[in-house]
Amino acid sequence: CIFVAHNVKFDANLLAEALFMEGFELRTPRVDTVELAQVFYPTFEQYKLSHLSKVLNLDLAQAHTAIEDARATGQLLFHLMDKIASLPRQTIEMLLTFSDNLLFETELVIRDAIRGQNLGLSKEYVMLEESGIVLRRPVAYKAERKLSQDFATNIALLDLESRPKQREFAEAVRKELDNTAISMIQAQTGIGKTYGYLLPLLAQADVDKVVVAVPTKLLQNQIMNQEAKALSDVFNINFHSLKGPQNYIKLDAFYQTLLRQDSNRLINRYKMQLLVWLTETETGDLDEIRQKQRYMAYFDEIKHDGKLKVDSLFAEYDFWQQSYQKAQEARVVVTNHAYLLTRMEDDHDFVRGKTLVIDEGQKMVLALEQFSRHQVNLTVLLQHIHRILDSGSQSLLQQRLLENLQFEVSHLIQEHQQ
């Protein structure tokens, strides 16, 4: 007999207290479905039973009712067991090296799942032999379907209804495509402008590749999860979300943390969560992990720094390198204002020959301001001036200029400290 609950620590204490009053003890193993859900559904936003019930279609008519909660928890456990059983055996074996960090006897569910598991690895996965880490194999792109020249037809194929203002905006975009100069189009919010500019662009045979820049990463993720997903599903359009390297997991750094003994239970649970996530993700984008804010120091340790050693175990499967390669091949690249500026500084040809759409262009000015700022550490600068003056190697003119600079910098520091 095993006691299973969603937040087992709380429920087990209540049950143990009730049994104690009757002269009994609770000695059965205890399994927590909250921690199991956190490990095996790494991209979920929440792990409340009510939220999991909506996402997984569990039977929970009335939350916080004992019978209803128990039924939904039982269904959740079956979902979790199926999910664990679907994972590669190699991943489950790695999970078991950290599973004693789960509450009470929760690891029993994982140990039970490995029995009868196939030793072979499915074609959808690839195992990096020396590390034992299993990744999802990249999926080949399907042949793109041709879009109609009629905006309303394309919207209908997406199972959406076109709106008058949206059609007007789309028509304005279509007309401007013949104009080789920069076009500026104003549109009110809430008209569905993302489809309004994407569909006319993608319908044009002479528009080869498109770069879309939006103000924030939040909007970037939103487009990828909504409009890009729909267009990819219906028309097989190849979209790619491009961000700075720090947004992606660095497999070398993650592997080093797997080799390390950590006493922090939360860190070890994150290691388990990431091992599961790596069998699912096609991007390696850490934004897919919604609960990472609980221990950002660990994620700062494993995020990419934009560098990759030639002899890296993961050179062939590095997510940041793959992301940049995918950006070269994608029909539509979605990025954000800040990273567009960074990318164009590093690669002057990044948008050459492509159609560039700057969504909410008025906000690009703010991004440019931020991008062009340079920081100077006044204390370090003052120390440097002192060293030069102490060396006595400068001419009289240089000495006077440095003394004036020394005075001004000292004055600035004093003003700041007041």
Please describe what each predicted stretch is:
Residues 313-331, 337-418:
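Signature of the SF2 helicase/ATPase Hel1-core->accessory helical subdomain module
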Residues 2-19, 44, 48-111:
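Acidic, Mg2+-coordinating catalytic module of metal-dependent nucleases/exonucleases
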Residues 139-184:
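Conserved pre-motif I regulatory segment
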Residues 79-150:
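Acidic two-metal-ion nuclease catalytic site recognized across multiple nuclease folds
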Residues 25-38, 212-215, 235-251, 352-364, ...:
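Conserved beta-strand -> loop -> alpha-helix junction used to position metal-binding or nucleic-acid-contacting
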Residues 152, 208-210, 214-330:
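A substrate-engagement module of RecA-like helicase motors
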Residues 178-199:
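Walker A/P-loop
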Residues 175, 194-207, 226-230:
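Walker A/P-loop NTP-binding motif
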